[in-house]
């Protein structure tokens, strides 16, 4: 397009509109500036250096926050980023020049430095001749879109108005019959009615106006020295200082009273001025800014005060004409005479504070005190405070005093050469001078450094920095700015301080062993314990500052993220395996093999195809999908081990051992039974030799195997040639670990038990890697064919979870701490030794040890005995019978979502609804769901469960249980486990949990992505919320950059992530994950998180006692106190209040609805009476308070005790207790017996412990059944049948349908459910 036409669309009009709206600049101006600069070509490059559509220089681009690489990833080549930056720059210039868009455009084109600044000054004077021809043409080209008071003058400058378009001959000779048209061009030739442009009145020449104002010419003014007016400036500083005012007032007759009046603040003056006095003050005080000299005084001194005020004004007016050097010198004098300059601000404390260097203590103190003095001076002498000048003067004064002391030090050094005297002030002073010059001259800040070759390896709270080698403690930031060591925002200083004294958790409720690991460790009084814990966990109460802990990824964060994505992978694999098993090879004809054998066969084919890629062509399409999922999973784990820094910690290094077969690795786990059979046949030494021979066969026959083994052995032995003996020894050593130990068998990877932390750093999966191939067969002594693969276990539903449990821990620890598991273990063991003899600290260190066990997939307790396994089976049955209402009850947890308005994504499971809700958004609901799945995976899942053989094997190997008992108890536990896991009510519980958490996170993702793409901000970017999530503003900006860089617009106008794997592996994605995790925490309590685990690992009996109560205990800190702390620490009091009110409404509403549903479990005749009791307003209020997710935890704890003591209101609020008939009132005059009290309390206790109650009801069922069989008459039989019905109801799910079914069965068998007549 050779000529600009605003009616011709471009591909970037949407970006222009979005950037213009976001930055408050004219769309037409921004668009035409882009056309003028580059003709809308994103890759345009000027010969002089500017690049991209908006033609940014390197310096300008960096100043605007763009990445400059001169490569294809240079942000100047990104139209969206460049246009937004240009809009931001134009908006700033327009505001700076009071809305003059032409002047802003000139500054954009010519800059504001050495070349541009004179042109801008000429523009202000109307001297267009002094503006370059390029600048004038640039402005003229924008006259039709730029608003400016100088537009008319520019248009007439240089002659007549610019010419119109040439007139074709056929138009010129067309005559008056030619059809005219309305255009934006000049009038056509068929009309001669040309009107000129009305011009403004002739302006007074600037030189004349300047002479009249200043009494000197421009040349005289410009030739002034920088120290011009020093005398006037110094007099003003001295006269108007506090000391000067005191001296001048003292010369008056009533001097003390006058000075007292000048220093008295207006608000403290009790005198009420009369109308006459007020009028006198208004008319006689020359400048209103100096009126405070008078208004603090008394009427007796009014004339003297007015005189002082006017003298102060005249002094300051003369000083205002002085040059910069004169003002600075006068400021130094002012600082010198001010008493506050000599206040020892830091004093003794600062001398021992290692983070503060001497020079900036002196300079910064003087600057700060001089600013305070400036405020005091203007309150006494009147006028406008010049805080910048005061700070500069004070700084230089402090520096000067420091220089004097340095001169003394230099003299001392000559006499004592061994002494060290450093002057560290020169660097900060030079930067200060450069910044002040840039500010005053509107030029580039020369104190900023070139950052192109800097690595920025340091980081604190999301702010990367590079050490400045020439100045101790100083750092360079990404934008090139340098921060001194004592700068309060220096990230290195802040990091060192946090390491010296890590922040402590906010006060919480500690309940011995039930105290959360996060609170116990981060709430420690020992700074060393907190220093370790801050990288591992988060406190449920948050920290004392209101943050949730580390402003970066903790080990628990990484562990939970990996666990979620692993669960998604397992579900994908399960579905792919189900599809593969439907292949005709397995699904047609006679039954060739069981489902288990079919699954194992497919797994084996997929694993071998990964290890030998040439086998992939033999796979069916469905088997290929299975293989791809497995391969992608192990490849991703390898990438994470190689680069754990993707979680945001630049100190994290690779923990992956060198491997010569990347991309073809599947963990080698050996089947215990297959190995035992081989040892029985060949002996351990025979099996070792067979394994080694099989491996040697691959070494001899496959060049790639030989090459990688030789390479490794050369490095290992430091030789140039590898001998056959070296290879054979390596093969035999590796084979010994398989044939002579259980280290790498399938039983050893199910769950490891270790004492303390001994050996916790050992990772058998990484140690088991070898460089041979295991698929080649050899002939054994008995003539049988054997390959190492014959010993392997290929069941991926056993191998993958075990591999992930172990590897995820090492990744999480390195990714958060920058340390290996061994280094962390050694640090914790040192803390343990230090805490010896202190029970409280020892308990906190043990909590740290347990945290590491959880992260690395180790058991915190010894293996369950037969007794404990039986108790866990009973717990399963109690859960099966009492969890019907819990899935629906999850809805009462979402008060936080409702209050923040984060409800749009609640329809994400209904395609039509979700698409409708996101129809107007730049990203579709389907894309959000896929992005969420790639980043967060699946939160709660029970797909991976121990098999019956695993449980039996564990009992036999880890306890002294015989085979028969192990089989019985193992089968029982497996059966109850499957019963509880497959229950529809369990699936509803897990399903609603995942659905609501996904909705909360997807809603936040949608908001942030939409706001980023449209240039807006969201509720999630508020300071209080970000602090509560431990996300810095810089990290939030990084999240936005991540979104912009990875999202592209499709043909349908919707944005999508072009590579979700790359998106999720970007370090900034971890900050996005943490932000969404905070949203999920506010949506629902998640007791399965690492930080919320009990600090003591309770056994099966403890779990039985606390079944269904752990949620209430965790709510005390995570919901009740955290809501309170968020309210007042993070300025979210309104959110906290609304969430409490909303949660009470949800709890009360759910209780009322649940009461109606529960009533259906009763006989029809008894429902009305039950509902009258349950729906009593007092009961509803009690339930609303006690079951509120935000406020209810304390009262719910009281209800736990109240239920045991028999209070009906405490029982009715619990969903695990079935509705009962009306209890007959006890005669109040009848004495109590111990049997009666213990019997009632025992019954109540069993109701509060569902698992124990289940056992009691099994016993009652058996005894009632025996009573029915042996009853002597019909009436007795009916009584036993009624008892049998009541005990049976407690053994089945507590949903109303099942309960009603039980009632109908017994009613059909003769049980009379109606009340007997009295």
From Swiss-Prot:
<comment type="function">
    <text>Component of the cylindrical core that assembles on the inner surface of the capsid during capsid formation and plays a role in viral DNA ejection into the host cell. The inner core is composed of stacked rings of gp14, gp15 and gp16 proteins. Following binding to the host cell surface, the internal core is diassembled and gp16 is ejected along with gp14 and gp15 into the infected cell. Gp16 probably inserts in the host inner membrane and remains associated with gp15.</text>
</comment>
<keyword id="KW-1235">Degradation of host cell envelope components during virus entry</keyword>
<dbReference type="GO" id="GO:0016020">
    <property type="term" value="C:membrane"/>
</dbReference>
<feature type="region of interest" description="Essential for viral DNA translocation">
    <location>
        <begin position="1314"/>
        <end position="1318"/>
    </location>
</feature>
<keyword id="KW-1236">Degradation of host peptidoglycans during virus entry</keyword>
<keyword id="KW-1160">Virus entry into host cell</keyword>
<dbReference type="InterPro" id="IPR000189">
    <property type="entry name" value="Transglyc_AS"/>
</dbReference>
<dbReference type="GO" id="GO:0098994">
    <property type="term" value="P:symbiont entry into host cell via disruption of host cell envelope"/>
</dbReference>
<keyword id="KW-1043">Host membrane</keyword>
<keyword id="KW-0081">Bacteriolytic enzyme</keyword>
<keyword id="KW-1162">Viral penetration into host cytoplasm</keyword>
<feature type="region of interest" description="Transglycosylase SLT-type domain">
    <location>
        <begin position="24"/>
        <end position="111"/>
    </location>
</feature>
<keyword id="KW-0472">Membrane</keyword>
<feature type="topological domain" description="Cytoplasmic">
    <location>
        <begin position="1158"/>
        <end position="1318"/>
    </location>
</feature>
<keyword id="KW-1030">Host cell inner membrane</keyword>
<dbReference type="GO" id="GO:0098932">
    <property type="term" value="P:symbiont entry into host cell via disruption of host cell wall peptidoglycan"/>
</dbReference>
<comment type="subunit">
    <text>Homotetramer. Interacts with gp15; after ejection the gp15-gp16 complex composed of a gp15 octamer and a gp16 tetramer probably binds both the viral DNA and the host inner membrane.</text>
</comment>
<dbReference type="GO" id="GO:0099002">
    <property type="term" value="P:symbiont genome ejection through host cell envelope, short tail mechanism"/>
</dbReference>
<dbReference type="InterPro" id="IPR023346">
    <property type="entry name" value="Lysozyme-like_dom_sf"/>
</dbReference>
<keyword id="KW-1171">Viral genome ejection through host cell envelope</keyword>
<dbReference type="Pfam" id="PF01464">
    <property type="entry name" value="SLT"/>
</dbReference>
<feature type="transmembrane region" description="Helical">
    <location>
        <begin position="1137"/>
        <end position="1157"/>
    </location>
</feature>
<dbReference type="GO" id="GO:0020002">
    <property type="term" value="C:host cell plasma membrane"/>
</dbReference>
<keyword id="KW-0456">Lyase</keyword>
<keyword id="KW-1032">Host cell membrane</keyword>
<keyword id="KW-1244">Viral short tail ejection system</keyword>
<dbReference type="GO" id="GO:0039678">
    <property type="term" value="P:symbiont genome ejection through host cell envelope"/>
</dbReference>
<protein>
    <recommendedName>
        <fullName>Peptidoglycan transglycosylase gp16</fullName>
        <ecNumber>4.2.2.n1</ecNumber>
    </recommendedName>
</protein>
<keyword id="KW-0946">Virion</keyword>
<dbReference type="InterPro" id="IPR038994">
    <property type="entry name" value="Gp16"/>
</dbReference>
<dbReference type="InterPro" id="IPR008258">
    <property type="entry name" value="Transglycosylase_SLT_dom_1"/>
</dbReference>
<dbReference type="GO" id="GO:0016787">
    <property type="term" value="F:hydrolase activity"/>
</dbReference>
<comment type="similarity">
    <text>Belongs to the transglycosylase Slt family.</text>
</comment>
<dbReference type="GO" id="GO:0031640">
    <property type="term" value="P:killing of cells of another organism"/>
</dbReference>
<dbReference type="GO" id="GO:0042742">
    <property type="term" value="P:defense response to bacterium"/>
</dbReference>
<dbReference type="GO" id="GO:0008933">
    <property type="term" value="F:peptidoglycan lytic transglycosylase activity"/>
</dbReference>
<dbReference type="GO" id="GO:0044423">
    <property type="term" value="C:virion component"/>
</dbReference>
<feature type="active site">
    <location>
        <position position="37"/>
    </location>
</feature>
<keyword id="KW-0929">Antimicrobial</keyword>
<feature type="topological domain" description="Periplasmic">
    <location>
        <begin position="1"/>
        <end position="1136"/>
    </location>
</feature>
<dbReference type="GO" id="GO:0044409">
    <property type="term" value="P:symbiont entry into host"/>
</dbReference>
<keyword id="KW-0378">Hydrolase</keyword>
